[in-house]
Structure formats: C-alpha cells, structure tokens
Amino acid sequence: QAFGAGNFRECTNMLARAIAVALLLGLLILTLQYPLGEAALWAMNGSQMTRDYYYTRIWAVPAGILLFGLNGWYNGMQNAVIPMCTAVTVNIVHMSCSLWFAFRMDMGIVGIAYGSVIAQWTGVALSVVLLRIFYRKKITRIDWREVVDLKPLRAFFAVNRDIILRTLCIVAVYTFFTGASARMDDPAMLAVNTLLLELFTLFSYMNDGFAYAAEALTGRFIGARDERSLRDCLRKCILWGMVVSVVFVGLYVGWWRELVGIFVEPDAPNAAAIVALAGRYIGWIIAIPLAGAMPFIMDGIMVGATHSRIMRNSMFCSTAAYFAIYYGLYGWIGNNALWLAFTLYMFLR
C-alpha cells in the first residue's frame, strides 16, 4: 500500500521493521536453542545424530526469518524476480554444499546441516546486495522513531499475528489429515491419502502464484486509491485462478493414473493395489480444485488489503467445520468423511 501511494519513506520503515523483528526473533531462538532443542529431542527420543543436526542447523534459522521478511518486502514492492533469484541460489548452494560436506568431506547428516546454514546466509547476502543495487535511490534514511511508532507497529504485528494463526490452522488440518489416515483400519489408506494429497499440492502451488500476485497488486492499487485498476486486477486474478482449476480438473480426470504412478514405485509389491485403491477416491481430487480455487486468491487479496482479520476468522470457521464434518460422518462413510471434510474446508474458506 505504501508503494502504491508513492510513500517510499514508509516503504523504508516497513523494511526496517521486518529486518528488526527478524533479527530479534532469530536472536531469541538462538538464545533459547538449548532448552527448546533438549525438550524436542526428549519428546521425540532423538538420537545423537539428530542432536548434532539440530545444533548445527539452528544457525540457519535467523537467516531463514530474514529471508521471509526481505522477500515479503520485495513482493510488496512489486518485485518477484529478486525473491525468485534468491530462492534458486539458495537451492543450488544448498544442494552443492550438502553433497560436498556429506559425501566428499564424509560429514554425513551434519554436512547437510552445514549446507543449509551456508545456503540460507548466502541467500541473505545476495538479497541485501540486490537491495543495495536496485533500491539504493528509493530507500530513504531510516528514522527509528517512525519505525517504532506504535500505530503502524500495531498494524504490522496484527497482520503477522493473523497470518500465524491462519498457518497454525492449516498445519492442524494437514497434520490431522495424516494422523487420521494412519489410524484407519486399512494400512494402505495412509499411502493412498498421502499420494492423493500430493496431487492437490501440485494444484496449490499453481494457484499460490495468483495469490501472491493478488496480494502485491491489491496493496499497490489500494495505496494508490485506484479502484478501477483494483477491480480489474481482482477480476483477472479470480478468472485465471478458475482457469487453472478447470485445467487441473481435466488433468486429474484424464491422467490420474499416470499422475499417481509418478509417486508409486512400479516394482513395489502392492503398487497395483495402491493405484486401484486411489481410484476409489479420485473423485475428491477432481472436486477439490473447483472448491479450492478461491481460498488462495482471497487470502492474497485480504493480506494485500491488510484485512487479515477476515482471513483469520474464515480460517477459524472452516477449520472448525472440518473437524465437525469428519467426526460427525466418519462412522458412516469412513475415509470419504475425511475427504468430504477437506473439500468443504477449502470451499468454506
């Protein structure tokens, strides 16, 4: 919104807030790494290898949080290229360093952790360098009194709070989905549901792109008070989201066996049985893109408009409905209750 209004002073303040909060949160996690780590290791009965990995990998956490803040700021500035370049660089460095340390240096899983740390901090360094190259003239001098001013700071934390609560609901739904699948009488049901959920994940990645576009452009046009462009942008984002949904429905109808086969080891003794069992529930995967086209885009619109409370409340209601539908119908229709609950959860969002 500040970008749309041409208020680069507030853009600078937002960047400073994001970096300051990321650094403070990262330092807090590093400070508490021992009690947090020991509690988690005790709860999961972690091995020495897990302990070594954790105490190495934890040093990448501040960099990861910083990258979230920097990438969010770039998206708000209508620049998706720098986050993409950063993500590609992080992945290349991560793979290269992990392979080098784990196999060439014979460091095992700790080597992979070192690869993660180096990759994340490389991403931060690249992001900061690109920030200085491309935004040096637009970034104003930081006035820390404005940065810590309570009114914009409250709004900043309110949006972050609502996004975190939304994310916790999503994690609860997906975690419960996996747990409920594992508790079913048929042990193959966990494999089938996981495979089918991967097909939904492919669709969600595509629609996430329109959600990010809606988020950035909604903020821009609201800040510029350009209602006509805002309406046009929202119509196009929704239209393309629906087009992607229809394309995926066609893809799932015509090639669901081939898509499921990608995730099934062909030589596995029960491969044919898993594919056949997946076919009994493929109708839900065909229905979900139609029910789930709008939630991603509407989340982007609400975040861009800073109406995150609406997004949070809709998530609370749909999550409650998800659990109510599952527990109300599981005794009658079994695994179909889980998929019906998930489909209606997406639709209600």
Where are these regions (language model features)?
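Transmembrane helix-bundle signature of multi-pass secondary active exporters and lipid flippases
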Residues: 1, 60-64, 154-221, 241-249, ...
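Small-residue-rich hydrophobic transmembrane alpha-helices
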Residues: 1-31, 67-83, 192-253, 292-306, ...
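Residue-level recognition of pore/gate-forming positions within transmembrane alpha-helices
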Residues: 17, 26, 30, 90-92, ...
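Hydrophobic transmembrane helix module of multi-pass membrane transport proteins
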Residues: 22-120, 125, 129, 133
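Short membrane-interface helical motifs at transmembrane helix boundaries
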Residues: 28-51, 55, 247-279
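Alpha-helical transmembrane segments of multi-pass membrane proteins
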Residues: 46-70, 195, 199-201, 269-298
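Membrane-interface helix-loop junctions in multi-pass transport and translocation proteins
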Residues: 91-125, 258, 319-349
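Interhelical loop/hinge segments that connect adjacent transmembrane helices in multipass membrane
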Residues: 116, 127-170
